[in-house]
């Protein structure tokens, strides 16, 4: 502890210790000031208790505004989240009514990603740097502008004098003549050479360019008289045209027969369905007389013979012994002419 003399030596100030002190409230503090001080003291005590409790506890109390998102006890309770269809924000299922009442339907903004520059262009810029030659003494100005740009960037300002550099990418490069494929050049250089016109099989009418028409004998662009007047044919035009039409008909018939054979082969080669085959056979049997293959006998043979014997006995009783009588009448017409007394 410093003595009074030492303190005066350290702080040489002109003041007297016995100086009279004037008080603001000589009679004591009023009631209003005392009440305010008490309220301030109680608030400070409550804050100190809360901070002490928070420091002692491991969990931190959440405000009431964050209950719809995290719940009152997020570490102890199981949270059931629901995503809103209007604003795409998650909230607890307990607060669905409160959220619908306060939901405005505005979705949160999506993060915008900047496009990544071409790696080849960046590598070229890094490798080149400032080593590229600049004509007409522009290199010094470029360096000066670059220095100014760096200073302005450090100070947080952009240099308006620096124009943006334009670089050509590989996509913007136009293909040169040497890059064209060799096949296209060969096609242009080597046109097709037309052969001589066969008058026996082709039209042969002279065209305005001095060449002969290379269409077939059935050419529809030229008239029949002009086609008949073509020289150099061994036979008349009509005979050659008829022979050509016959050949075409034979070809058409051959094609028809070939297609028919192919269709038959395809039908035989196709897989047979058992259900279709059964249905086909049943339809054929129904349409072939409607008679079963085996008939059921409703009356045995022995009983049928007994019926015949009784019928003959009755018929003989009605005849009164006349054996040469003609078999006519309702009853006698159904009688078999053999003796009923003789056993069968």
Curated annotation (Swiss-Prot):
Residues 123-143 have a biased composition (Polar residues). The keyword Transmembrane does not apply. GO terms for cellular component: chromatin; DUBm complex; nucleus; SAGA complex. This is SAGA complex subunit Sgf73. The keyword Lipoprotein does not apply. It is found in: Nucleus. Belongs to the ataxin-7 family. It comes from Schizosaccharomyces pombe (strain 972 / ATCC 24843). Residues 190-256 form the SCA7 domain. Component of the 1.8 MDa SAGA (Spt-Ada-Gcn5 acetyltransferase) complex, which is composed of 19 subunits tra1, spt7, taf5, ngg1/ada3, sgf73, spt20, spt8, taf12, taf6, hfi1/ada1, ubp8, gcn5, ada2, spt3, sgf29, taf10, taf9, sgf11 and sus1. Coiled coil: none annotated. Residues 123-196 are annotated as: Disordered. It holds the Pfam family SCA7. InterPro entries: SCA7_dom (IPR013243), SGF73 (IPR037804). GO terms for biological process: positive regulation of DNA-templated transcription; regulation of transcription by RNA polymerase II; regulatory ncRNA-mediated heterochromatin formation; RITS complex assembly; siRNA-mediated pericentric heterochromatin formation; transcription initiation-coupled chromatin remodeling. Keywords: Nucleus, Transcription, Transcription regulation. The lineage of its organism: Eukaryota, Fungi, Dikarya, Ascomycota, Taphrinomycotina. Component of the transcription coactivator SAGA complex. SAGA acts as a general cofactor required for essentially all RNA polymerase II transcription. At the promoters, SAGA is required for transcription pre-initiation complex (PIC) recruitment. It influences RNA polymerase II transcriptional activity through different activities such as TBP interaction (via core/TAF module) and promoter selectivity, interaction with transcription activators (via Tra1/SPT module), and chromatin modification through histone acetylation (via HAT module) and deubiquitination (via DUB module). Its main location: nucleus.
């Amino acid at each position: 502890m410093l003595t009074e003399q030492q303190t005066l030596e350290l702080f040489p100030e002109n003041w007297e210790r016995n100086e009279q002190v004037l008080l603001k409230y000589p009679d004591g503090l009023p009631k209003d000031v005392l009440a305010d001080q008490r309220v301030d003291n109680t608030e400070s005590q409550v804050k100190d208790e809360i901070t002490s409790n928070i420091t002692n506890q491991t969990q931190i109390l959440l405000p009431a505004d964050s209950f719809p998102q995290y719940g009152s006890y997020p570490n102890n309770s199981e949270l059931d989240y629901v995503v809103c269809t209007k604003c795409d924000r998650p909230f607890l299922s307990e607060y669905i009514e409160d959220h619908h009442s306060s939901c405005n339907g505005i979705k949160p903004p999506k993060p915008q990603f900047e496009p990544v520059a071409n790696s080849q262009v960046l590598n070229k810029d890094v490798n080149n740097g400032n080593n590229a030659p600049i004509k007409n003494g522009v290199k010094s100005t470029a360096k000066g502008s670059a220095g100014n740009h760096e200073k302005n960037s450090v100070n947080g300002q952009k240099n308006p004098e620096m124009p943006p550099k334009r670089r050509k990418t590989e996509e913007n490069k136009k293909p040169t003549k040497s890059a064209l494929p060799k096949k296209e050049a060969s096609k242009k250089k080597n046109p097709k050479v037309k052969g001589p016109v066969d008058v026996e099989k082709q039209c042969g009418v002279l065209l305005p360019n001095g060449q002969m028409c290379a269409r077939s004998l059935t050419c529809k662009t030229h008239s029949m008289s002009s086609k008949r007047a073509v020289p150099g044919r061994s036979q008349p035009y009509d005979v050659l045209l008829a022979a050509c039409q016959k050949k075409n008909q034979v070809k058409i018939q051959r094609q028809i027969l070939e297609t028919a054979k192919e269709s038959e082969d395809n039908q035989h080669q196709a897989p047979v369905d058992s259900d279709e085959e059964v249905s086909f056979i049943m339809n054929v049997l129904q349409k072939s007389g409607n008679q079963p293959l085996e008939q059921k006998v409703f009356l045995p043979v022995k009983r049928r013979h007994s019926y015949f014997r009784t019928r003959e006995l009755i018929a003989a009783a009605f005849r009164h012994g006349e054996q040469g009588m003609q078999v006519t009448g309702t009853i006698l017409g159904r009688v078999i002419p053999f003796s009923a007394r003789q056993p069968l």
